[in-house]
Amino acid sequence: METSSSSPVKPRRKDKDEDGRAEQEDSADQVGEPHRKLLRLGDILETNEVLLNEAYQQPELTKWLQTAWTEEKSQGTKETQTGAQVFSDPFQICLLPGMLEKGQSQALVAEIIQKVQWSRKQMDLYEFYQSADLSNMPACRLLTNFLQVLRKQVRPWLEKVTNLKLDYVSASCSMYTCGDYLLVHDDLLKDRQVAFIYYLSPWEGAEEWTDEQGGCLEIFGSDDQCFPQFPVQRKIAPKDNQFAFFKVGSRSFHQVGEVTTFDYPRLTINGWFHGDTNEAFVADSLRAFPRLNYLQPDGLNRPPLGLFLNNVYLKGATRRSIQKRIEENSEICLYEFFKREKFELARSQLLADSDTLKWRRQGPANAHNYEVLDLTTARGTILELLQLFRSHAMFDLLRDFTDLDLAGTDAESPTCSVELQRWSHGNYTVLGDGLTSEENTLDLVYYLNAAEGAAVITYLAPDAEMPTAKAPTDGRRSDYDDEEEDDSVLLTITPVDNALNIVYRCEGTTKFTKYVSRNTPLEKGPVFVISCSYKE
């Protein structure tokens, strides 16, 4: 099949003006939310400068932190006077409650609400609001002063505590409203040595968040290959006027859990202390995610397509029409692909059979988080459909649909991978998860028990995940401006029951499945996806 080298997958786009208006309205609504919280701040301290808590400037505390930082106490250790805590497992992290003098966090929040301009950051890894770098915000007097405190007081103090050479600091403000999140990453980039988060939540009754409100800093352990593993090992809830910092390394995996409260935004000042090139950076850049397992067609199984497929897709004229559409657009969606009774039987079995079917969580956590079926436990209609996708009959059909050499005398050694996935709240895949196509590939995506907003797949142009832009201050990859994001998106697949999506993607094309927010309605239960890839 011939495809355009400039457009591996041709997208169906919305009107840009319409998208822009909707985004502006949504952004205005959400950015305006913190302003209403100003009324609940109470009396705001009139101050011209940010002052560190004197308790953290005492030599005795510095010495205690130095000792605690180097000790290997997995359960952590706590200082009685300040409540400072240090944990070494799964990596070194320190919590300093009451970092600034009383009333300072209120004054900072008031200035943030009144003066900070927010930019919406939205990609596979994150959704939240971010300010400019504090060094570029001269109108924000207290924030500028906070940056100076980090530079002149906190940086040399951290050098003593951590025994690391720290040259400079970068910082910005982040705001997470309900539904926002930042998925698993390690912060490891070039010269980052120590990451920090200063929490701002001075609202009465919300000084320390509960687990039900979300927004926790969630810490992950990792395996022998430095891949983060489920479940979350430690949670640190937002707490007003608390300063957290940790050593950036090949195991410093963490995420910001989805904010689930509409009452308050999660506000922080966050960034990094930088030094020499991080020693762990080179090794991390060579770490590869696991790849899909490709198998040859199942020669023992050749099910009659007429028992399963909608009869319209067996007609020669329909096949030729599909082939022409795929040749022109590199994709097509075939509605009501299977006979309705087969689809209903399969969906019912997936929802009801909790004893026989065995599922396992698919990791590592910095690549993906969803469940996959142990195919050896498949029975009944589910087994029949899975066998069909790997059968010679399906390879023959896909040859007719696409003109690819997946069957016949010109076929050399065609292969496929078949996976049955289960998607619920909190599930995702991210860019760079091993699903970048290293050669031309035909993807099939089939939904059962579909729900709007769950298991939505986005295809991006080659190299779209690595634009030449500045690094974000609360994530691992580069920022995207609106134009770059829009132009890089080739196709978005939205869930539709009993619809087979066929996508031909060229070498270098990548994809991700958007994080399933807790706000996504899943009243009918989880969404199931049969995901297949075929190679000539």
Swiss-Prot record:
It catalyses: [ribosomal protein uS12]-L-proline + 2-oxoglutarate + O2 = [ribosomal protein uS12]-(3S)-3-hydroxy-L-proline + succinate + CO2. It is found in: Nucleus; Cytoplasm. GO terms for cellular component: cytoplasm; nucleus. Residues 14-24 have a biased composition (Basic and acidic residues). Binds 1 Fe(2+) ion per subunit. Residues 165-275 form the Fe2OG dioxygenase domain. Monomer. This is Prolyl 3-hydroxylase sudestada1.
